[in-house]
Amino acid sequence: MKKGTVLNSDISSVISRLGHTDTLVVCDAGLPIPKSTTRIDMALTQGVPSFMQVLGVVTNEMQVEAAIIAEEIKQHNPQLHETLLTHLEQLQKHQGNTIEIRYTTHEQFKQQTAESQAVIRSGECSPYANIILCAGVTF
């Protein structure tokens, strides 16, 4: 049995294949996922698993250099936005690097998901609960 934090074989596999600056998306249940992009569907029912649960597991295993978030989250989901920023701050301390946070429009965000290695869909049902993680290096 794998000893690491990620037991899901699809998520573990995609993280292990990430190269520097490759991207991985963690999204809510409603984000449209391009047909050309690998979909890893974790959603069981509304809210299960939550966006933050999925993000926490992914970032325990993935070295993150930058994060892209839809600008609209600030207005339409401020509580999750604050939780997300706190998580990224803690991740910076744990990794020992600065994580650049970039904001974009939701429309541009959706277009960028097509270039990611995979999209991991959570059961989150709150607005703009999506993030694009850019892979860093551990050396």
Swiss-Prot record:
Judging by the UniProt lineage, the source's domain of life is Bacteria
Signal peptide stretch:
none
Enumerate the residues binding substrate: 28, 106, 128-130
Q: Which reaction does it catalyse?
A: beta-D-ribopyranose = beta-D-ribofuranose
Catalytic residues (positions): 20 (proton donor)
Q: Which UniProt keywords apply?
A: Carbohydrate metabolism, Cytoplasm, Isomerase
Q: Give the main localization category.
A: cytoplasm
Record's function text: Catalyzes the interconversion of beta-pyran and beta-furan forms of D-ribose.
Provide the family line: Belongs to the RbsD / FucU family. RbsD subfamily.
**HAMAP family recorded for this chain?**
D_rib_pyranase
What's the name of the protein? Answer: D-ribose pyranase
Name of the gene this protein is made from: rbsD
